[in-house]
Curated annotation (Swiss-Prot):
Protein name in the entry: GTP 3',8-cyclase
HAMAP family: MoaA_B
Cofactor: binding comment: Binds 2 [4Fe-4S] clusters. Binds 1 [4Fe-4S] cluster coordinated with 3 cysteines and an exchangeable S-adenosyl-L-methionine and 1 [4Fe-4S] cluster coordinated with 3 cysteines and the GTP-derived substrate.
Organism, as annotated: Salmonella dublin (strain CT_02021853)
InterPro entries: Aldolase_TIM (IPR013785), Elp3/MiaA/NifB-like_rSAM (IPR006638), MoaA (IPR013483), MoaA_NifB_PqqE_Fe-S-bd_CS (IPR000385), MoaA_twitch (IPR010505), MoCo_biosynth_MoaA/MoaC (IPR050105), rSAM (IPR007197)
Amino acid sequence: MASQLTDAFARKFYYLRLSITDVCNFRCTYCLPDGYKPGGVTNNGFLTVDEIRRVTRAFASLGTEKVRLTGGEPSLRRDFTDIIAAVGENDAIRQIAVTTNGYRLARDAANWREAGLTGVNVSVDSLDARQFHAITGQDKFRQVMAGIDAAFDAGFEKVKVNTVLMRDVNHHQLDTFLAWIQPRPIQLRFIELMETGEGSDLFRKHHISGQVLRDELIKRGWIHQLRQRSDGPAQVFCHPDYAGEIGLIMPYEKDFCATCNRLRVSSVGKLHLCLFGDGGVSLRDLLQDDAQQYALEKRISDALREKKQTHFLHQSNTGITQNLSYIGG
């Protein structure tokens, strides 16, 4: 039934964010401040390589061009390299990326690249080792920096770095970040702190609009770039004097959802139409046999009829997202 995934608002979906675990070994203040707590799913309960192969095959048939593997921390899965290779079996999928805390990047970047990974996003919320430790609960700053070096050495031409923008934590460190990306092709993406079910107090204390940074970048001569159809939601800025780029992800900005091009599947096989939506559509019963592909594609396409025009974060409605590891942030 191959046809491009399109919703009731004529938005086309080229991008799948696929969570492969909700386990994480970091304790970031904005995500899992008390550390990972199993939610009734054992490691054996997460999608298998065969199930991942089937779900990505179905999405590829429906026009998906990019798959991002998320968590939790994806690299904690021992079969992570096999998962990359399984996704890469689909010729229609042109980009396979991972969002990682960088814990195992120095060790494994070359193997991931060889398996077919084309993009790496690393979470780095501070360039100060002590503050990094305070935010993540792990004294791994130098290890993560070595991982970014290893990614470049492995042949990744660009590395994306995700930084959650927090008032009185890192929002005043723009000059430090800019100096870091000046000589290197790093796309540094500042992500507005988002309210989650478990993070309301933190949100009220530390949220700051990315508009503040955008105004400053424009004042300094940074130029807004056009988005490609399978790009994520970042507004990307470049500057002739910098090898790196700046991205801004501002989910509270008006019309943020108008260009939505991505869907999410959780680590237990639920399709989520929005990071902050309700419920979810189970796909797992249709991931057990190759012969189920038509039914799987139909269920995915039919589910899109229910996708809302916008999220409801402005009303502090975070849907089922209790924390950002739940369905892959």
